[in-house]
Amino acid sequence: MEKRRAGLFDLDGVIFDTESEYTRFWREQGKLAHPEIPDFSSRLKGRTLKEILAEYFPQEQQAREIVRRIDDFERQMDFPFIKGSLEFVGILKQNGVKVAIVTSSDDKKMKNVYRIYPQLKTLFDAIITADRITRSKPDPECYLLAAEQLGRKPAECVVFEDSFPGLEAGRRAQMKVVGLATTNAEDQIRDKADRVIPDFSRFTFSDFVHLYSIK
């Protein structure tokens, strides 16, 4: 039965402890370009860079400058892991569970990730980026595509997410959802997930299997 299961992982705030860094980056860009939007960084959670540029930086020169800034920013990032995330992915693999990264990040950003952690290319059975989809979270397209690539039905998949759009995408894909309280407080996401965890340090394979019995 385990071999018909899959774990689908968002990247920032789930695998990597980087969400706070992106919040600071976009907060600064918001102060410079959109001081009239106080919650600028919050509005961008789960959205692709293409969408952000189209809506908030539509002028070509402005968009080009933002792309340059974020590329420089990501080149300097260390991409630290959320506690226990890499180990938990390994446990799923050992038990025959298919695993995928499902991220709103693009291929360009992933090149910076692979530069530091080339093993991620082979650790995950599929990697879905913003360049593979037409509609970003909260649309379920990315998670449904991941399930299809892994040869799994939605009911056989568990989504691990931290952002409101990502949690909603998992729900709309009709998958089990585990919320990580890394970006938002536990009480803010409790009603949007089947289980909420602070990180993966105490989340076991038995906990993972138990999710499938939740109605």
Regions found by a protein language model. Give the residues of each.
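Asp-based, Mg2+/Mn2+-dependent phosphohydrolase catalytic module
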Residues: 1-5, 90, 106-215
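N-terminal helical cap/lid subdomain that shapes the substrate entry/recognition surface
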Residues: 2-95
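Conserved phosphate-coupling serine/threonine residues in phosphotransfer and NTP-handling enzymes
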Residues: 14, 103-105
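Non-catalytic, surface-exposed connector residues within folded enzymatic/regulatory domains
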Residues: 43, 64, 82, 104, ...
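Short phosphate-binding/catalytic loops that engage adenosine nucleotides
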Residues: 95-97, 175
